[in-house]
Swiss-Prot record:
Keywords for this protein: Cytoplasm, Glycolysis, Isomerase
Regions that span the bilayer: none
Pfam families on file: His_Phos_1
Entry's family note: Belongs to the phosphoglycerate mutase family. BPG-dependent PGAM subfamily.
Subcellular location: Cytoplasm
EC number(s) from the headed UniProt entry: 5.4.2.11
InterPro entries assigned: His_Pase_superF_clade-1, His_PPase_superfam, PG/BPGM_mutase_AS, Phosphogly_mut1
Organism of provenance: Saccharomyces cerevisiae (strain ATCC 204508 / S288c)
UniProt-recorded name of the protein: Phosphoglycerate mutase 2
Length: 311
């Protein structure tokens, strides 16, 4: 028997991207633009299947809008999912909240509309891991010791040393590899984030604590995601982010304390359902994983990164 999601419920499907090339190698990725592995693509396909099954069982439309970071691993994840949904993603970089174009079809009841707007923002990017980016987690653990390593990784105020962009960012369009000893580098910001750099109100980070991720993400959540949900009376949306950006969303939506957030770990590629009450200012109702057993096992693996070898 099919159940129906109550009409007052807005459903957010939150997802950490599928496994990336650097997740697989146990390397701090941050703003390095790592692609998905084959396992990561399979995780994206399986996530789409779980969401589709959930929507069908609860008489809920598939997500009508999607959100990703500006990093390729989230874009590849959502594109793979859209392929499973048989939807055509319409990608749009958001660098100004007042310049969003959703198309005439958005918000209509047309079940035959196969297009889905995908809004991409740097505000959903992974936490910037400063000089730890591109470094193997066991090596960083050895250098800093367990207590400082875990404080910087998990505490709300923990912050790595800043990145030296002269050494750890690609300096020109056709640069290959590295002559500075850094095997993995950030993309050139003037190219990758050209639109953001044209908006002088945007200051891109060189290192971040989780508090700073919450601070830069919250305006997008309030002024875009939740505003559009209200404006178009959306029943569901899909947000593909990163470990730290998903943790930040949960902290804001659920009201998790600064101390308790350090105990929240987000596994790759397992959809998390967050229900909000439309009749009460989109207030948090509840959250649950669509594959809770796998989520528990893999969240524990996330917590232990650096201490144990990745499978």
């Amino acid at each position: 028997m099919t159940a129906s999601t109550p009409s007052n419920v807005m459903t957010l499907f939150l997802l950490r991207h599928g496994q990336s090339e650097l997740n697989h190698e146990n390397i701090f990725c941050g703003w390095i633009d790592a692609k998905l592995t084959e396992k990561g693509k399979e995780q994206a396909r399986h996530s789409a299947e779980l969401i589709e099954q959930y929507c069908k069982a609860n008489n809920l439309r598939l997500p009508q809008i999607g959100y990703t970071s500006r990093l390729i691993r989230t874009q590849q994840t959502i594109e793979t999912m859209c392929e499973e949904f048989k939807l055509k993603p319409q990608l749009q970089v958001v660098y100004d909240f007042n310049k969003i174009k959703l198309g005439d079809e958005f918000g209509s009841d047309d079940k035959d509309n196969m297009k889905i707007p995908i809004l991409q923002t740097w505000r959903l990017n992974e936490r910037h891991y400063g000089s730890w980016q591109g470094q193997r987690k066991p090596n960083v653990l050895k250098e800093y010791g367990k207590d400082k390593y875990m404080f910087i990784r998990r505490d709300y105020e923990g912050k790595p040393p800043p990145v030296d962009l002269d050494r750890e960012m690609i300096q020109q369009e056709n640069e290959k590899g590295s002559s500075t000893g850094y095997e993995f580098k950030e993309p050139n910001r003037q190219i990758k984030y050209e639109l953001e750099c044209s908006n002088h109100d945007i200051v891109l980070p060189d290192s971040e604590s989780l508090r700073e991720v919450v601070y830069r993400l919250n305006p997008f959540l309030q002024n875009v995601i939740l505003k559009l949900a209200n404006q178009y009376d959306e029943s569901s949306c899909l947000i593909v982010g990163h470990g730290s950006s998903v943790r930040s969303l949960l902290k804001i939506l659920e009201g998790i304390s600064d101390d308790d957030i350090k105990n929240v770990d987000i596994p790759n590629g397992i959809p998390l359902v967050v229900e909000l009450d439309k009749n009460n200012g989109l207030k948090f109702i509840r959250k649950f994983y669509l594959d809770p057993e796998s989520a528990k096992i893999n969240a524990e693996k996330v917590r232990n990164e650096g201490f144990i070898k990745n499978p």
